[in-house]
């Protein structure tokens, strides 16, 4: 059971609000007010390069059935869980319903919610927020590439700035986020 200060989502003495990250958020938090460095002992979550972003990158998202991989986390400098959630939505350019917040109701795309709730409760965090965007590939929202070859094939079609951004995203993804598709994508860009 949560005590009063946690149930209200307000930071009390010694209570931490944290963000989970696995992609560009880790190396480019933008407006997100992080406290200290990213920690490498985040929850293990089902992630894959499965969402084509507006700029053409194939980004890491929570993906049903994907191989679970370790994530990262950092403490945030906000006074309520809702403020941390709103800040992450702003950084991601996403609607609030696409940003998870625990404790609370699962986001629309709830993949990983149970694991995050268990991890957050076990650490005694006051609130945990994360990006809860769905896979999107080949114009289909909610579906990712069928396999690594399809993902690599898509990346092989990119040119110019889109190719540069996509290559940077794969290259700079945290080392511990070794998804099932990652080796094939690195080979596409000859990343070593």
Q: What do these predicted ranges mean?
A:
Residues 2-192:
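A glycine-rich, hydrophobic/aromatic-adjacent loop/helix-cap motif
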């Amino acid at each position: 059971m949560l005590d009063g200060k946690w149930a209200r989502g307000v930071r009390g003495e010694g209570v931490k609000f944290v963000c989970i990250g696995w992609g560009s958020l880790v190396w480019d938090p933008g407006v997100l007010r992080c406290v200290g460095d990213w920690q490498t002992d985040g929850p293990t979550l089902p992630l894959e390069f499965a969402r084509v972003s507006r700029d053409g990158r194939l980004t890491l998202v929570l993906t049903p059935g994907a191989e679970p991989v370790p994530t990262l986390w950092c403490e945030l400098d906000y006074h309520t869980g809702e403020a941390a959630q709103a800040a992450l939505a702003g950084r991601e350019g996403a609607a609030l319903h696409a940003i998870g917040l625990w404790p609370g109701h699962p986001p629309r795309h709830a993949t990983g919610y149970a694991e995050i709730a268990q991890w957050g409760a076990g650490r005694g965090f006051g609130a945990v927020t994360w990006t809860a965007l769905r896979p999107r590939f080949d114009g289909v929202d909610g579906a990712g590439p069928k396999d690594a070859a399809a993902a690599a094939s898509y990346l092989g079609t990119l040119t110019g700035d889109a190719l540069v951004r996509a290559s940077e995203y794969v290259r700079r993804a945290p080392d511990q986020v070794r998804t099932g598709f990652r080796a094939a994508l690195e080979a596409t860009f000859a990343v070593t």
